[in-house]
């Protein structure tokens, strides 16, 4: 049954990822805002959810964490987009993207952790 839950939540996460990409994607843009957006949102939600999750069953935590949020965020796309920016000699955008992804992700994770912690009290 666990695989079924992960598959269902994975479908939802992948669909949300696609919809977010459609919402934020601009073909003329040099900077990949859609990937940055989903990764920052996903990082925040995973941290918040992980800390708040004890009220849910182990199966639900795994299904939502692995299925929904795992399929919503994407590290491989970060790598491809960064290499693409470097190959087209958009070095500043590549550096900004990696920096925002790392530091923005850490900030979103910390914020999610703190808000999740506050909600448990």
Protein language model regions, located:
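Membrane-interface helix-loop junctions in multi-pass transporters/channels
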Residues: 1-121
């Amino acid at each position: 049954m666990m695989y079924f839950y992960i598959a269902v939540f994975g479908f939802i996460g992948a669909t949300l990822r696609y919809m977010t990409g459609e919402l934020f994607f601009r073909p003329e843009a040099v900077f990949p805002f859609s990937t940055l957006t989903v990764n920052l949102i996903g990082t925040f939600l995973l941290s918040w959810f992980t800390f708040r999750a004890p009220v849910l069953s182990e199966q639900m935590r795994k299904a939502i964490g692995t299925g929904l949020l795992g399929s919503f965020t994407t590290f491989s796309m970060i790598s491809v987009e960064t290499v693409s920016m470097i190959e087209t000699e958009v070095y500043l955008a590549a550096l900004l993207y990696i920096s925002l992804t790392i530091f923005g992700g850490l900030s979103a994770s910390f914020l999610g952790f703190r808000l999740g912690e506050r909600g448990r009290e």
